[in-house]
Swiss-Prot record:
Feature: compositional bias, Polar residues: 446-459
Name of this protein: Syntaxin-binding protein 2
Family of the protein in this entry: Belongs to the STXBP/unc-18/SEC1 family.
Keywords: Disease variant, Exocytosis, Protein transport, Transport
Gene Ontology biological process: cellular response to type II interferon; intracellular protein transport; leukocyte mediated cytotoxicity; neutrophil degranulation; presynaptic dense core vesicle exocytosis; regulation of mast cell degranulation; vesicle docking involved in exocytosis
Gene this protein is translated from: STXBP2
Coiled coil regions, renumbered to chain: none
Source species of the chain: Homo sapiens (Human)
Length: 593
């Protein structure tokens, strides 16, 4: 499946703006990258795309490399001390340099001292290109971005890192500005009123964007572009969503299974022996894209249905008994191994999720939903929430982190509990080793303890929804309400102030060009969006249920709006709790991601 949305835009920017810009017919080049730029490139380009553009080898600047003095090198690097020193070192050797010449592309603005150092080095004699491409984020999915900065939560919210806070906000602001510039957006910027950080970050992004606008006056131009908005909100607005056991396919799999770097590993039984398979869960897999936001109850059904349709299209008869026995189908259709393996992977993944669900997760889901909603499946208000949680806390079979998730949901429902009550709950749950993790929710802006036993909340209240849902999936992330209000122009301007005056809304009713619709081709040949975008940035990590909301709201506008969401990093419930755990520790006592 070809990259779409954000991935396509970034991939095209690298291929056209970097590699093709220095390409000469019949000439091969070497591509050198560091770890951050390698992560950006691999998130949106295949190695075959790179090699097809006259690149003979791709190398890591921090690893030992064989000199190729007959070829020119393209350097795609983040502008850091380490990478710049490694670059200079490539052109210090005698009698020959590592490469014939250098085309240097920095992912972001190169600090003046490093720039001066480059100018003083021997490298200056062989530099043919030197550009800053302003690409300081990862396109994680078509509508999801990551700043690849999981450590930023610690820098922003740990009391021991107070002196780092302003610098960290400046770095994040620059990264968000590069996202807007890459998308050709100059959005109106709004923030959730209350926390100091959201206002500070919003003002910093505006300053960085204004600098981009001064360099590129056409940034954000277009009849519909004046409606684009960037919303900045904090994790305290909805601390519930990252704690819940979600039952949609992607969120559930990443919560319950050991998926690392988006890779799912599972055992397959071949004709002779079992072997491990590793499968990347990404948008190259169209089946994953179709299934990832579906409820688990519908996933296996859907895969089986798609598999049956596929078999029938190849004139292979199937029945209920053999449709899941893929090894039998494979024997009859070995030429379709690639397609059948895809179905096999997703059946495995769904079965794996269901095994965990049928274990202890099912009963946890019911308790969590009642606590999150404040009411039961019938809509009756929860009168005794303590009665709900005690069986979970006392159950030795429930893992510590699952107990903590329930405990935090209880505390959030109550808007804090008394110190005495908290101590008892921690003791009942036997999670004394994690008591600071629970208290650290306060650092993010949540209320954990209150002398009176119940306090006020900084959370946004979810709106009541009428659409039918599964009993164990009643909760809707609050961010979805915010997105819907933003695209309908219903967001309260007092609660969500603008950092600069929004553009006049007369153009909001302007007809989109009948010739181009909401898309037009830019110079690079990729489709650029002419309609408005809503970009949502969540400080402190974004949950997978919130990622799903961006796609749902986009779909509901029938393509009139495109909603993008992102953060410093993508959260799973375990990741969220690990982030909380670090917030009262000194730097030397933790291992930052």
């Amino acid at each position: 499946m070809a990259p779409s949305g954000l991935k396509a835009v970034v991939g095209e920017k690298i291929l056209s703006g970097v590699i093709r810009s220095v390409k000469k017919d019949g000439e091969w080049k070497v591509l050198i990258m560091d770890h951050p730029s390698m992560r950006i490139l691999s998130s949106c380009c295949k190695m075959s795309d790179i090699l097809a553009e006259g690149i003979t080898i791709v190398e890591d600047i921090n690893k030992r490399r064989e000199p190729i003095p007959s070829l020119e090198a393209i350097y795609l690097l983040s502008p850091t001390e380490k990478s710049v020193q490694a670059l200079i070192k490539d052109f210090q050797g005698t009698p020959t340099f590592t490469y014939k010449a250098a085309h240097i592309f920095f992912t972001d603005t190169c600090p003046e001292p490093l720039f001066s150092e480059l100018g003083r080095s021997r490298l200056a004699k062989v530099v043919k290109t030197l550009k800053e491409i302003h690409l300081a984020f990862l396109p994680y999915e078509a509508q999801v971005f990551s700043l690849d900065a999981p450590h930023s939560t610690y820098n922003l919210y740990c009391p021991f890192r107070a002196e780092e806070r302003t610098r960290q906000l400046e770095v994040l602001a620059q990264q968000i500005a590069t996202l807007c510039a890459t998308l050709q957006e100059y959005p109106a910027i709004r923030y959730r009123k209350g926390p100091e950080d959201t206002a500070q970050l919003a003002h910093a992004v505006l300053a960085k964007l204004n600098a981009f606008k001064a360099d590129t006056p056409s940034l954000g131009e277009g009849p519909e572009k004046t409606r684009s908005q960037l919303l900045i909100m904090d994790r305290a607005a909805d601390p519930v969503s990252p704690l819940l056991h979600e039952l949609t396919f992607q969120a559930m799999a990443y919560d319950l299974l050991d998926i690392e770097q988006d890779t799912y590993r599972y055992e397959t039984t071949g004709l002779s022996e079992a072997r491990e398979k590793a499968v990347l869960l990404d948008e190259d897999d169209d089946l994953w894209v179709e299934l990832r936001h579906m409820h688990i109850a519908d996933v296996s059904k859907k895969v089986t249905e798609l598999l049956r349709t596929f078999c029938e299209s190849k004139r292979l008869t199937t029945d209920k008994a053999n449709i899941k026995d893929l090894s039998q189908i494979l024997k009859k259709m070995p030429q379709y191994q690639k397609e059948l393996n895809k179905y096999s992977t997703h059946l495995h993944l769904a079965d794996d999720c269901m095994k965990h669900f049928k274990g202890s997760v099912e009963k946890l889901c019911s308790v969590e939903q009642d606590l999150a909603m404040g009411s039961d499946a019938e809509g009756e208000k929860i009168k005794d929430s303590m009665k709900l949680i005690v069986p979970v806390l006392l159950d030795a079979a429930v893992p510590a982190y699952d107990k903590i998730r329930v405990l935090l949901l209880y505390i959030l429902l109550r808007n804090g509990v008394s110190e005495e009550n908290l101590a008892k709950l921690i003791q009942h749950a036997n999670v004394q080793a994690h008591s600071s993790l629970i208290r650290n929710l306060e650092q993010l802006g949540g209320t954990v303890t209150n002398p009176g036993g119940s306090g006020t909340s900084s959370r946004l209240e979810p709106r009541e929804r009428m659409e039918p849902t599964y009993q164990l999936s009643r909760w809707t992330p609050v961010i979805k309400d915010v997105m819907e209000d933003a695209v309908e122009d219903r967001l309260d301007r007092n609660l969500w102030p603008f950092v600069s005056d929004p553009a006049p809304t007369a153009s909001s009713q302007a007809a989109v060009s009948a010739r181009f619709g909401h898309w037009h081709k830019n110079k690079a040949g990729i489709e650029a969006r002419a309609g408005p975008r809503l970009i949502v940035y969540v400080m402190g990590g974004v949950a997978m249920s919130e990622m799903r909301a961006a796609y749902e709201v986009t779909r509901a506008t029938e393509g009139k709006w495109e909603v993008l969401i992102g953060s410093s990093h993508i959260l799973t419930p375990t990741r969220f709790l690990d982030d909380l755990k670090a917030l009262d520790k000194k730097l030397e006592d933790i291992a930052l991601p």
